[in-house]
Amino acid sequence: MAIRKPALSVSEARRLAVARSEIHHPNPTLVPQELDLQHLPEKADEKDQQREPPVAEHIYSPDRQLKLTVDALSPPPSPKKLQVFLSARPPAPQVSKTYDNLVRQYSPSKSLQMILRRALDDFESMLADGSFRVALKSYPIPLTTEKSVLVQTSRMFPVALLEVARSHFDPLGLETTRAFGHKLATAALASFFAREKPSRNW
């Protein structure tokens, strides 16, 4: 039986084995340079982002803009007010047509209170424009030996108008609080009654 001659020599077989090992385990030094540069753009982007200057926060603030808008649309603060204790007596018959009509349905106190609220509203305007200085300060009341009705109430008055009224009705500052309130309410009612019939002369 003849011996078969190998297809490759010993040296060729060694070269083939070395070549196969290089295919499965490539040499890092032989890797193309492009593989190491794959992540370079990302790193460059990160550095660029870090170098960008921060945007100033005070350029525009929605909360601040909203606050300024609300302040501009808000009504002005209301004037400071003080409570004033008022008192007045019902008018004599035929002094006020309004009172004479109301007293047919309500008590004298209730009727006068309803008129006094309106009279004080009007008198505040008179204090503001100065027309109260030439207005009547009193009106006729019933002549009776019995104790007449005294209506008492209170009202919040603007401080500025209250100072004007006090300087007029109590220039010396000696009146008590209730005495001043009685003069103020009486003057307000007198002005209201006078406007019902301007020709009336008490």
From Swiss-Prot:
It holds the Pfam family VirC2. Residues 24-56 are annotated as: Disordered. Keywords: Crown gall tumor, Plasmid. One of its GO terms (biological process) is regulation of DNA-templated transcription. Residues 36-56 have a biased composition (Basic and acidic residues). The Ti plasmid contains at least six transcriptional units, designated vir loci, which are essential for efficient crown-gall tumorigenesis. This is Protein virC2. The gene is virC2.
